[in-house]
Amino acid sequence: MKAGIIYNEGKPLAVELAAHVRRILELQGWEVHMATGIGGILGYSRPDSPVCHTPIDQLVPPGFDASMAFAVVLGGDGTVLSAFRQLAPCEIPLLTINTGHLGFLTEGYVADLEPALDQVLRGDYTIEDRTMLTVQVLRDQTVIWEALSLNEMVIHKEPLTGMCHFEVDVGAHARVDIAADGLILSTPTGSTAYALSAGGPVITPGVAALQLVPICPHSLASRALVFSNSEPVWIYPANPFKHLILVVDGNAGCYIQPEDQVFVQRAPYRARFIRLRAPEFFHVLQQKLGWGLPHVAKPRAKKSTDS
């Protein structure tokens, strides 16, 4: 039996808990492999060296493979995103424990760790699959950069904000011209992140959709677009200035030159979340983002007793 641990090495609590979880598992006969969240951070390229290419399948840490029953993630949302970039190709289900701040993507808190681990070891859990994206940058019809994304891909001007022009092909539909500070291409999971702040809708996780959200568009008619996740997307920068920057899940970036093309499609891999209770997305929205809460106290609606 093999299990894994991914932890945020920059947080002393996560480091301490990782060692604790390892001891618990090894005492029960599990083979345990550990890796840090930094392994899923792709880093940023530089204008004078715009290519920083790590193939998707080369991010899998040593010892982690498809035979692993599960892995425990100890950190915040950034560590969860990093863990899935590393482990999604192996389809390892992850138990996510929040040692960070918001923890929108985590299943439990530190106080829940040991009961949650016991529940997983008993096999008393379900798995929720989430859509991921494959993001590729092509230059002269050759892939020069790629990454997995659970939340979103963003393209904007670098280093200052300013109007950008894009031509976008969604599936076989007519090409769309967009003038905006940038573009966000988001999964349903990412619809509660940057896309939400940019005015995009919240999409429940089970919907087979993606969304394209312009950032501060220079048009009253330019709005977020929701479309089937089976449709690939091509983005062509149409800008007189030299560089744009492409960012995946807030931490991995690649400079985009005017002749480059960006190709995004639903990834062949899934983010597999271990759920200890039936997922209730609206409850998470209320708890984490304050959505749907009453502004004033009001009496409950009563069922009519009239015949």
Swiss-Prot record:
Cellular component GO terms held in the UniProt record: cytoplasm
Catalytic activity: NAD(+) + ATP = ADP + NADP(+) + H(+)
UniProt-recorded Gene Ontology molecular function terms: ATP binding; metal ion binding; NAD binding; NAD+ kinase activity
Biological-process GO terms, alphabetical: NAD metabolic process; NADP biosynthetic process
Cofactor: a divalent metal cation
Gene3D superfamilies attached to this UniProt entry: Probable inorganic polyphosphate/atp-NAD kinase, domain 1, Probable inorganic polyphosphate/atp-NAD kinase, domain 2
Chain positions recorded as NAD(+) binding sites: D77, G78, N151, E152, D181, T192, A193, Y194, A195, L196, S197, N251
EC number(s) given by UniProt: 2.7.1.23
Active site, UniProt feature: D77 (proton acceptor)
One Pfam assignment: NAD_kinase
Subcellular location: Cytoplasm
Annotated keywords: ATP-binding, Cytoplasm, Kinase, NAD, NADP, Nucleotide-binding, Transferase
Family classification: Belongs to the NAD kinase family.
Record's function text: Involved in the regulation of the intracellular balance of NAD and NADP, and is a key enzyme in the biosynthesis of NADP. Catalyzes specifically the phosphorylation on 2'-hydroxyl of the adenosine moiety of NAD to yield NADP.
Protein name as annotated: NAD kinase 2
Gene designation: nadK2
